[in-house]
Amino acid sequence: RNAFGETFPEQKKNVKKAAQAIADLVEQKYQIVITHSNGPQVGMIQTAMTEFARLDNDKNYTVAPMSLCGAMSEGYIGYDLQNAIRTELLDRGIFKPVSTIITQVRVDPFDKAFNHPTKVIGRVMTREEADAEEEKGNHVVPEGDGFRRIIASPKPVDIYEIDAIEALLDAGQIVIAAGGGGIPVMEQGTTLKGASAVIEKDYTAAKLADMVDASHLMILTSKEQMETADGQAIGKISVSDAISLIDENHFDAITTLPKVDASVSFVSSGEGRTAIITKLENAYQGIKERIGTIIK
């Protein structure tokens, strides 16, 4: 589901719920790094910027690239989230700084995902508009009575702002980073060039958790637990059991597979690690391993 909603009032309401769950963990002295989805937000920004350019008869404005749209979504979602967390903590008598970092994530230009795009973005287009997009080298797919653009979802390779994230953690701050999977970039000499892609947030969360050497990775979603293909709830399982379930195609490739696969990657990358997948409201109970899907 979309974690933050499609309108600004809906987002305000949902970030308050997220802030309450996070504050529960802070009260128990957990050190926290937060990443988040940018669900429809990045697509809405891209649609708005594209429409603005299309309606500008004087051609003073151009379409914003996906990397820029991703940066915008990181900024405004992070702004709402950090202020909601700050307020919730102060209401509980806790002073703890919260900072948002606009985060660039390196992707491999040869990642096979660029040849098999999966993420649908933007508004519905006419056949003529879709043809124009394809002439630019973009991919489109049919949707309803029209067409929409589809972009790649490569895996994260490195996080450029990791030193800044760790410095803030060492200073006792709560850090919001790599929102929406981070801004996908490629190295070109000394330049970081934005890629026309959206990184799957679950994989970036696992990469970030690994790089800061976290003990736990929590993926908070709309489900209390993951389920097998025949609807059986998945509780505490080993990495090998999780891999077997992946190999047996128990998870949807777009929605649940990345969560389980990213959890396996994180737990397998270090000693004594645990991944938890559960509902946002269950964050505290989840980290105590009382509820949710626990992989360790």
List the predicted regions and their residue ranges:
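C-terminal catalytic "cap/lid" subdomain
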Residues: R1-K296
